[in-house]
């Protein structure tokens, strides 16, 4: 039985990472794919837990060998989702979450037309700016650049299947769970899981 592929994207400051981690921790048979990146680890990040931290040479070898479902360059660093991190899980019937941007969604959807894409929105522009300012002692120019990048990401919201507003964390988390559960209840997926029951009922 094949699992479902979920893509979750959001502007920086929308709370995407916390939401997808909570989703993966609260539901059975769903995993969060861990991306490869060439950027150095930030304080508190662990290799193999937050990202697979690799050199440019390793990344290029993987890319050249067709090892990525999607890859992109962001602020001078490279990010990619390895096929080996996703395909075996799907084949086992596990659902997989990809935490990527709109560009990555386009690449993945070209290969998996039936994947489910979700975009996380902040509740307001003011809240988004406030969250971005909380990330560090940045200059006004840096905050303005981050806001510009966030708005550019948001402009692609209409390429996604679902929109979830992260104002109240628990409400947004419940919304994400509902999307996953609705996918699991689709007839085509349930037919496989309930094959013996259906056979018995239709004898």
Swiss-Prot record:
It comes from Nitrosococcus oceani (strain ATCC 19707 / BCRC 17464 / JCM 30415 / NCIMB 11848 / C-107). InterPro entries: GK/Ca_channel_bsu (IPR008145), Guanylate_kin-like_dom (IPR008144), Guanylate_kinase (IPR017665), Guanylate_kinase_CS (IPR020590), P-loop_NTPase (IPR027417). It is found in: Cytoplasm. This is Guanylate kinase. The gene is gmk. ATP binds at residues 10-17. SUPFAM superfamilies: P-loop containing nucleoside triphosphate hydrolases. It holds the Pfam family Guanylate_kin. Keywords: ATP-binding, Cytoplasm, Kinase, Nucleotide-binding, Transferase. Residues 3-181 form the Guanylate kinase-like domain. NCBIfam families: guanyl_kin. It comes from the Bacteria. GO terms for cellular component: cytosol. Its EC number is 2.7.4.8. Belongs to the guanylate kinase family. PROSITE patterns: GUANYLATE_KINASE_1 (PS00856), GUANYLATE_KINASE_2 (PS50052). GO terms for molecular function: ATP binding; guanylate kinase activity. It catalyses: GMP + ATP = GDP + ADP. Its main location: cytoplasm. Essential for recycling GMP and indirectly, cGMP. PANTHER family: GUANYLATE KINASE, GUANYLATE KINASE-RELATED.
């Amino acid at each position: 039985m094949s699992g479902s592929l979920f893509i979750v994207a959001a502007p920086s400051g929308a709370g995407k990472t916390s939401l997808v981690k909570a989703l993966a921790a609260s539901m059975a048979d769903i995993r969060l794919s861990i991306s490869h990146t060439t950027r150095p680890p930030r304080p508190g990040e662990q290799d193999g837990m937050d990202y697979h931290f690799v050199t440019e040479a390793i990344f290029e070898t993987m890319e050249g060998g067709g090892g990525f479902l999607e890859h992109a360059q962001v602020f001078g660093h490279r990010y990619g989702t390895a096929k080996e991190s996703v395909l075996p899980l799907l084949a086992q019937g596990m659902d997989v979450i990809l935490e990527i941007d709109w560009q990555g969604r386009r690449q993945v959807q070209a290969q998996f037309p039936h994947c489910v894409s979700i975009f996380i929105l902040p509740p307001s522009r003011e809240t988004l700016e406030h969250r971005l300012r909380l990330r560090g002692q940045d200059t006004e120019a840096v905050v303005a650049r981050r806001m510009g990048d966030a708005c550019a990401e948001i402009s692609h919201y209409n390429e996604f299947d679902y929109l979830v507003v992260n104002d109240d964390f628990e409400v947004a988390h419940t919304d994400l769970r509902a999307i996953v559960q609705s996918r699991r209840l689709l007839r085509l997926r349930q037919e496989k899981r309930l094959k013996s029951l259906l056979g018995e009922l239709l004898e």
